[in-house]
């Protein structure tokens, strides 16, 4: 917990710096070796098997992140990338000469793996072809000064584009010959919106007909998967003709593919494309060049570049881990002086390195099996403390533990534990806030090691001599995530830091402690994310904790669109709901709740629990009669149940899998509230359709309007 272990949550977003000893795709961040300008990385024998001599490097297109070119290069290097793609508009806008860019990359340990893009080359007009060849010669001059040997040529979208494979092949042959004479190569890519060439199958046929050693393919996951093409055919392409690989994820969207590509690409693992399968096909073809990210995203290009670059590298590490299990590798291979177990998650393709001077990286332990929430810690100040503690008491929680040296109380009912942290160091902001989450796992040390290997910032801690030894990392929004093995009778359990209070009973410290109102455990925690950290948070929880996306939704809230994404472990023991406002225009017309957070407690009978809580003075959120009239029309719950829900303010949802009853409290301390939930059958949702009702009710509470609506 933030104060009981000495780590603090100040509300500032983690910088994204790599923990000491973390790795970058097969090389320690202090041992990157630049690739020479004449290197031919990416060209291997056809169908070359994955072997100890194979080393897959990582690269980041400068277009992925914000800032000037110098900012982007620094961020890529700090994150641990091996190389970059120089996006031509970034270079043209830079005050640095090509030689300066080359030297800066060398100083940072970055190779320049690609110069891109060269657009609209082929032409039906002879004079335009000559102009394009002249333009290419000038770009080749730039490439030589930059120290890169590979240029990306996109299929044409121009009105004079050719629809003749033989003529396009002939023109590309001319281009490749000019490049070859200067020690350079050309990588041809089919844009998904190309005028005529818009599939990888056709681009490969053109390259095959051109038949020039300096001409190969660039394979881009977005251009292929956005069109619904089958990537399995990539395996039939000779590996020595796969010059470059660009990776991007994306959500499935029914829109113009150009707009989809330019605004909504994501890092691997953040969207819905099956990139592990895609990468597996590319590697099966014999590709061993860089794994490069080319992601156009409006949010990423507004965000701080260094955290975005760290998120990008984390996505590649997780992708390699996911892909590895699908490849027909032997049980173990020798890598340098060590052995890499191909069955171990994290013994990624990057670890299959025989490069001299490149150490074998430590492998990431497997995804931890989670046993639920150990706790959800709230930071409170003097103003919010009475309201939060009062609501917990009305919900049947007991103050059953007190840290002996730090201002942290432990409140518990059943297996639901809520530490209240009164320390100024633990406060993310004024009022109340979720400061930390504890997740149960049998091997906290392994779970923490995995988090660090996946570039999660390890939090500093201040541990007393008799305190439990806990490890924590920072989520993208600054929330601390602890790995716990609670074990009530275990002296190393974090519970040992909280001697019982006089309010505790003999059963309070177990998972069935305290009768209360019937709360059994924490069902889920909901966290609003900063605008530029929503996708990063989903990737963090997916890669570090193994939480998979259950579903995503968009809600028409009273003050704008809210995007939700629910993630959970396979058993449903740990569920986290992430949300973000799609657009934010300030607070002058948003007198509701800023960045709300809430903790949901599970119960077997929400009506009985709510009645008991209300009688104890719980600040139950009032729901208007209009909701229940509409509910009766839509879902027609039993009349007795409907009347009880109307009386108590309980909300309801139902689908083919089951039913969901839930109740909210008023907002406590500015942004935090509680929820009681009852799941019936196999219902796995969160009652999202009721969210606008809750948001409007919270606004009424905050403004004092509609006090008599009932």
Say what each PLM segment does.
Residues 25, 35, 39-44, 54, ...:
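Glyoxalase I/VOC metalloenzyme domain signal
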Residues 76, 84, 105, 143, ...:
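Conserved, mostly hydrophobic/aromatic
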Residues 101-118, 169-181, 206-212, 273-278:
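Alpha-helix-loop-beta-strand connector modules within alpha/beta enzyme cores
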Residues 83-84, 174-272:
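Acidic/histidine-rich catalytic cores of soluble enzymes
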Residues 2-5, 10, 25, 31-148, ...:
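N-terminal pre-domain/capping segments
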Residues 63-70, 87-98, 120-130, 158-163, ...:
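Acidic-and-aromatic substrate-binding clefts and catalytic sites of carbohydrate-active enzymes
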Residues 32, 46-52, 122-216, 307, ...:
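Active-site acidic/histidine proton-transfer and metal-coordination neighborhood
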Residues 56-62, 84-86, 112-117, 151-153, ...:
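Hydrophobic faces of well-ordered beta-strands that scaffold small-molecule active sites
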């Amino acid at each position: 917990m933030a104060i009981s272990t000495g780590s603090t949550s100040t509300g500032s977003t983690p910088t994204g710096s790599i923990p000491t000893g973390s790795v970058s795709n097969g090389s320690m961040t202090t041992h990157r070796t630049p690739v020479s300008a004449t290197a031919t990385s990416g060209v291997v024998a056809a169908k070359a098997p994955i072997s100890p001599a194979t080393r897959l490097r990582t690269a980041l297109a400068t277009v992925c992140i914000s800032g000037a070119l110098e900012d982007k290069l620094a961020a890529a290097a700090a994150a641990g990338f091996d190389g970059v793609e120089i996006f031509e508009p970034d270079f043209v806008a830079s005050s640095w000469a090509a030689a300066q860019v080359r030297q800066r990359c060398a100083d940072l340990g970055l190779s320049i793996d690609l110069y891109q893009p060269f657009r609209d080359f082929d032409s039906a007009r002879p004079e335009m072809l000559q102009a394009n060849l002249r333009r290419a010669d000038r770009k080749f001059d730039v490439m030589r000064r930059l120290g890169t040997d590979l240029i990306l040529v996109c299929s044409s979208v121009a009105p004079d584009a050719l629809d003749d494979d033989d003529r396009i092949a002939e023109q590309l042959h001319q281009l490749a010959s000019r490049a070859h004479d200067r020690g350079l190569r050309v990588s041809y890519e089919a844009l998904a919106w190309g005028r005529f060439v818009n599939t990888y199958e056709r681009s490969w046929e053109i390259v095959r007909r051109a038949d020039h050693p300096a001409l190969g393919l660039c394979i881009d996951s977005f251009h292929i998967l956005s069109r619904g093409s089958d990537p399995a055919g990539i395996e039939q392409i000779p590996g020595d003709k796969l010059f470059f690989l660009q990776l991007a994820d994306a959500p499935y969207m029914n829109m113009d593919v150009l707009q989809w590509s330019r605004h909504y690409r994501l890092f691997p693992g953040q969207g819905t494309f099956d990139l592990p399968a895609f990468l597996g096909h590319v590697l099966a073809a014999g590709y061993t060049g860089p794994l490069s990210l080319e992601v156009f995203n409006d949010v990423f290009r507004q965000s701080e570049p260094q955290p975005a670059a760290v998120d990008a590298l984390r996505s590649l590490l997780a992708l390699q881990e996911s892909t590895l299990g699908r490849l027909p590798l032997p049980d173990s291979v020798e890598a340098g002086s060590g052995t890499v177990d191909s069955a171990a998650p994290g013994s990624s393709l990057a670890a299959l390195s025989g490069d001299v001077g490149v150490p074998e990286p430590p492998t990431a332990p497997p995804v931890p099996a989670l046993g639920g929430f150990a706790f959800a810690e709230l930071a409170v100040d003097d103003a919010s403390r009475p309201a939060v503690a009062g609501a917990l008491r009305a919900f049947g929680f007991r103050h059953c533990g007190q840290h002996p040296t730090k201002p942290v109380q432990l409140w518990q009912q059943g297996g639901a534990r809520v530490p209240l942290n009164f320390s100024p160091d633990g406060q993310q902001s004024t009022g109340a806030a979720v400061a930390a989450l504890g997740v149960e796992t049998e091997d906290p040390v392994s779970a923490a090691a995995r988090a660090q290997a996946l570039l999660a910032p390890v939090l500093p801690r201040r541990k007393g001599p008799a305190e439990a030894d806990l490890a924590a990392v920072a989520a993208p929004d600054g929330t601390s995530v602890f790995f716990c093995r609670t074990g009530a009778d275990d002296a190393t359990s974090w519970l040992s830091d909280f001697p019982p209070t006089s309010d505790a009973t003999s059963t309070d410290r177990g998972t069935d402690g305290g009768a209360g109102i019937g709360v059994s455990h924490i069902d889920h925690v909901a966290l609003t994310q900063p605008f530029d950290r929503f996708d990063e948070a989903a990737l963090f929880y997916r890669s570090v904790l193994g939480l998979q996306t259950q579903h995503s939704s968009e809600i028409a809230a009273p003050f704008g669109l809210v995007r939700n994404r629910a993630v959970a472990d396979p058993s449903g023991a740990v569920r986290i709901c992430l949300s973000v406002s799609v657009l934010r225009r300030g607070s002058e017309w948003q007198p509701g709740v800023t960045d709300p957070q809430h903790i949901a407690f599970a119960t077997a009978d929400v009506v009985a629990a709510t009645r008991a809580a209300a009688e104890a003075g719980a600040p139950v959120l009032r729901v208007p009669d209009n909701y229940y009239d509409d509910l009766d029309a839509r879902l027609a719950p039993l009349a007795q149940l409907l009347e009880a829900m109307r009386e108590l303010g309980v909300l309801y949802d139902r689908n083919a899998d089951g039913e969901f009853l839930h109740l909210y409290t008023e907002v406590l301390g500015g942004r935090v509230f509680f929820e009681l939930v009852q799941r019936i059958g196999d219902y796995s949702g969160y009652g999202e359709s009721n969210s606008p009702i809750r948001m409007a009710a919270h606004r009424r509470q905050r403004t004092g309007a509609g006090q008599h609506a009932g």
